Amino acid sequence: MVRIAINGFGRIGRLVLRIALSRKNIEVVAINDPFITVDYAAYMFKYDSTHGRFDGEVSHDGKALIIDGKKVLVFQERDPATLPWGAEKIDIAIDSTGIFKELDSAQKHIDAGAKKVVITAPSSTAPMFVVGVNEDKYAGQTIVSNASCTTNCLAPLAKIINNAFGIEEGLMTTVHSITATQKTVDGPSHKDWRGGRTASGNIIPSSTGAAKAVGKVLPELQGKLTGMAFRVPTVDVSVVDLTVKLAKPATYEEIKAVVKKASENELKGVMGYTEDAVVSSDFLGDTHSSIFDAAAGIQLSPQFVKLVSWYDNEFGYSTRVVDLVELVAKN
């Protein structure tokens, strides 16, 4: 039984808790969030505007959440180094704050007594692992990153296509649902002026490092992909549009067949495949990292194609976080 703690009880932290509770080999011991009191944590965990009510009993005793009779301690420390991870025998701390995402800052969890750390954000210093893509390269590193939700969608698809046909170069666009960093009405956003505009009333062009990060988990694609994002007024579920120049000519039928085969074999559970006339809400709660939309892609020539793949940027990603925790626990 692996003992875990969750730092940061936001969208990802709460969903990671939901998913972890359903895994027999994981015990969630504690959560920490300096901005959330225990009674508020109970409320936020119980009710979710996007994914619905938690299917179980949720209460608290003033110090801990009580979920279906099981206690989960709640702390409110700003500095992770002061958390009692040693006393609580924490094997893996999951950091979903978006703040402690580099080796030096995530080290605070180790200093507090945790054995390992999984960061739920891309990192420029911690090694990044994408389940289904490069998790076989995990060699016991103490602090790891689960990359971003968009990299988790793009990388499995890019791996399949590159292995079968070769990718010479490509551009990615993610049409991405709103996230917590955006504004309900126009407000100050000094680093990203467009990002400060009303989330619910605009299509907002934005930057993303997700495509370049694929080169970190698939070195053979280093320098071959880049991309951008459009933030759109949907609450959850996003879609990747990958336009690539192939090294080897292929028909669209051949591409579909290769992706379908991978989704049923080595990437089962990570890569999905559909030929249905789907829209974004059809993927709410989908646990795949990426679901290939066979009916949406187009081909211009034997070596130039646009491929489309959906992802629940909250739930699919959080599922992979827990998968990575299990992998780290085994090694």
Curated annotation (Swiss-Prot):
From which domain of life does this come? Answer: Eukaryota
The reply to whether Methyltransferase figures as a keyword in the UniProt entry is: no
Provide one Gene Ontology biological process annotation.
glycolytic process
* Entry binding sites for D-glyceraldehyde 3-phosphate: S148, C149, T150, T179, T208, G209, R231
Q: What is its EC number?
A: 1.2.1.12
List ligand-binding residues for NAD(+): R11, I12, D33, E77, N313
Q: Which residues carry this modification: Phosphoserine?
A: S148, S177, S200
Where are the active-site residues found? C149
Family classification: Belongs to the glyceraldehyde-3-phosphate dehydrogenase family.
Q: What is this protein called?
A: Glyceraldehyde-3-phosphate dehydrogenase 3
- Record the organism: Kluyveromyces marxianus (Yeast)
- GN (gene name): GAP3
